[in-house]
Amino acid sequence: MNKYLKYFSGTLVGLMLSTSAFAAAEYAVVLKTLSNPFWVDMKKGIEDEAKTLGVSVDIFASPSEGDFQSQLQLFEDLSNKNYKGIAFAPLSSVNLVMPVARAWKKGIYLVNLDEKIDMDNLKKAGGNVEAFVTTDNVAVGAKGASFIIDKLGAEGGEVAIIEGKAGNASGEARRNGATEAFKKASQIKLVASQPADWDRIKALDVATNVLQRNPNIKAIYCANDTMAMGVAQAVANAGKTGKVLVVGTDGIPEARKMVEAGQMTATVAQNPADIGATGLKLMVDAEKSGKVIPLDKAPEFKLVDSILVTQ
């Protein structure tokens, strides 16, 4: 069984990418993973938009958000399958630079989703993308932190940030947005900012240590909901549910339920379905234009807004 996964019609199957030189559909999408509801929602948005546009699309994902080599090989294989266009969400800003450059040189229409590829290095490698579609992740982090600041009021207090994976542009942008917001509030003291690699169990462990070292902490902002759920468990284990604010990011269904139940305080909800749908439409529109974006032209930049979900 090949470790790459292809998802279609609600069914999970193994795909041996080397069995055919031809694409099964007109377009392909490479997501980070499908073990996180955020990416499942994006997949659904892409599928719905494909039906609206009347196009066919194959959707692929790496086994995990840390498997950089697998995603690189997956993209390389797909770029040899005669797809008209490929939309992709890189696991880091640099892991797909070279294969994306090669795909652009082949005349494939390329759209970057969520995690921004390193455009400086991509241009140096001789490649470009039609568009970049994402949420303003600095604003997302700032929105979560600002909510915490408002909730704590004039009294303020100690807060912490649970970051994503080191080197991940989306996570770093959220951390930076939250950090700047906290620093601007004189009544707030940021006592810890540590990565938990987007992982629930790691976040549980990190938050447990943060809570033990900082018994007066009043709030924790998390760069995604998967980690926030682990943090909420750590807060519960410490007997501090409702006493320590837990704010996540993404607005996945399980996190929303935890907010409703009072186990989490809030989540900054992205719209992954809209990100995926917008990316597919931009890719199809670019292909219909009949001309791949020139190397010296700036990609179209599309921001999808976020909303704060509270009780």
UniProtKB/Swiss-Prot annotation:
Keywords for this protein: Periplasm, Signal, Sugar transport, Transport
GO cellular component, one term: ATP-binding cassette (ABC) transporter complex, substrate-binding subunit-containing
A GO MF term: monosaccharide binding
PANTHER family given in the database record: D-ALLOSE-BINDING PERIPLASMIC PROTEIN-RELATED (PTHR46847:SF1)
Gene Ontology BP, a term: transmembrane transport
Protein name per Swiss-Prot or TrEMBL: D-allose-binding periplasmic protein
CDD domains in alphabetical order: PBP1_allose_binding (cd06320)
Cleaved signal peptide residues: 1-23
Domain of life: Bacteria
Functional note: Part of the binding-protein-dependent transport system AlsBAC for D-allose.
Family of this protein: Belongs to the bacterial solute-binding protein 2 family.
